[in-house]
Regions:
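Short, glycine/charged-rich "phosphate-handling" switch motifs in NTP-dependent
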Residues: 109
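Receiver (REC) domain active-site loop signature in two-component systems and cognate sites
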Residues: 63
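Acidic, metal-coordinating helix/loop segments flanking the phosphotransfer/catalytic sites
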Residues: 38-56
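Two-component/phosphorelay signaling modules centered on CheY-like receiver
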Residues: 18-37
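C-terminal output helix
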Residues: 98, 116-129, 133, 137-138
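CheY-like receiver
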Residues: 130-178
Length: 178
């Protein structure tokens, strides 16, 4: 695990729940962070991002005025925000796939389910710092590239050989002989 200089990082934590902001702030302080700015809704979160130029935004998904998904979209709009490359970690009590996909499609860098643990938060922060994803722009999206790395040397039974769905292997149909 790479060591992170938390004392050199600036965070904005946007969450409408004061108790959750306090938990995240306490964890960040325990990691060594000195600069933490808080916001109680999406609008003040965007203002804090513009005012403090953080290194990372940690945002709840459900907040008043506009939620974490809308906040992420606003930040990822290069014409609307000065920090479109800002790493964004979405926190949510909603762990259903549709919420994870919505956050990903809005341009979130990471998704973390509540209740949050110190280890999980540290790993997400470490990932956005040590292993940042390249950004891509399409007609409908600007944000971290969510495509997975394809290892050309992998030759397992689930290896895709082309772009067509006919090459997708159904694990239930694979018979491996010993």
């Amino acid at each position: 695990m790479a060591k992170i200089a938390f004392d050199e990082l600036r965070f904005v934590v946007a969450d409408d729940n004061a108790h959750m902001r306090r938990i995240v702030r306490t964890l960040l302080r325990a990691f060594g962070c000195r600069e933490i700015y808080e916001a109680e809704d999406g609008a003040s979160g965007l203002e804090a991002v513009e005012a403090y130029s953080p290194d990372i935004l940690i945002s709840d998904i459900t907040m008043p005025i506009f939620d974490g998904i809308e906040l992420t979209r606003m930040i990822r709009n290069p014409e609307g925000c000065r920090h479109p490359f800002l790493p964004i970690i979405i926190l949510s009590a909603y762990s259903e796939k549709k919420h994870v996909i919505a956050a990903r499609d809005a341009g979130a860098s990471e998704f973390l389910c509540k209740p949050v643990s110190a280890t999980a938060l540290y790993r997400r922060i470490q990932n956005v710092i040590a292993n940042p994803r390249d950004f891509i722009r399409t007609k409908t999206y600007f944000g971290p590239d969510r495509r997975r790395y394809v290892n050309p040397n992998y030759s397992g039974v689930e290896r895709r050989i082309g772009d067509g769905s006919e090459n997708i292997v159904d694990p239930d149909q694979v018979h491996i002989e010993a």
